[in-house]
Amino acid sequence: VAGFSLTDEKARKAQKTNSEDLKTENRGCANMELNPLRMDEYPEITSVVDKYYQSLGDKASFVEAYDNIKVYTKLGKYKDTYVAFARYEMKIKDIYTKVPGLGTVYVCKDKDGGYQVSAAVEEEDIKSYINEIAQHEDVQALIEETQTAYHEAVQSDALLQEALMDLKNAYEDSTGS
């Protein structure tokens, strides 16, 4: 009997471990009406995305800073995950006009209860989900607003046009494309 209860206890632990590995899907998250784009709705998400962009600015040699970051979120496919659309103004060194931009990152809760940003998602189901919600009307409107602001900024500043062309050429040279 003692052997049985030990085995039973091990089975319960194994079952508990397996159930923790399962992801709980957010119901209705793919529906725009049930999962609208929200600006600065979750302070902890906004904070971690801000820090992410500040660190990007610190690492990039041509970027002075990412300013005026506004974080728009939609619930991620699974519990405690979010898709964040970060609209920002990038300050390129020695260029007066800031460049409007929009980045997409995946934010998920880590084992310690904090949130972390992932710019490169590996899981195909999550990539597919992000592509799906990026087609929502509210996200498309944000993309269009950002593209319009970008084109206006580029058209207004010849030095910015030149700097962006130099960056594009440097990128293409480094990747061989």
Specify the residue positions occupied by each region the protein language model found.
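Mature, Sec-exported extracytoplasmic domains of Gram-positive
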Residues: 1-177
